[in-house]
Amino acid sequence: MANIKSAIKRAELNVKANEKNSAQKSAMRTAIKAFEANPTEELFRAASSSIDKAESKGLIHANKASRDKARLAAKLG
């Protein structure tokens, strides 16, 4: 455990950030799985939106976001 006050604060902030980032990534994965189970236009838009949000927050790389959206679009038809 950290002994320096600022290091303790950073550790606490890192825990909060990790929880927030994990929740966002989980929501993205859930939206993708929902689309793959039932590929509709509405679910495609929801999945694309969640992928874009994860990309803009730095959770996934821009290339991965593009690749994932392209694969979903191909499944849409």
UniProtKB/Swiss-Prot annotation:
Gene3D superfamilies: Ribosomal protein S20. One of its GO terms (molecular function) is structural constituent of ribosome. Coiled coil: none annotated. The keyword rRNA processing does not apply. The keyword Ribonucleoprotein applies. Keywords: Ribonucleoprotein, Ribosomal protein, RNA-binding, rRNA-binding. GO terms for biological process: translation. Pfam families: Ribosomal_S20p. One of its GO terms (cellular component) is cytosol. Belongs to the bacterial ribosomal protein bS20 family. HAMAP family: Ribosomal_bS20 (MF_00500). Binds directly to 16S ribosomal RNA. This is Small ribosomal subunit protein bS20.
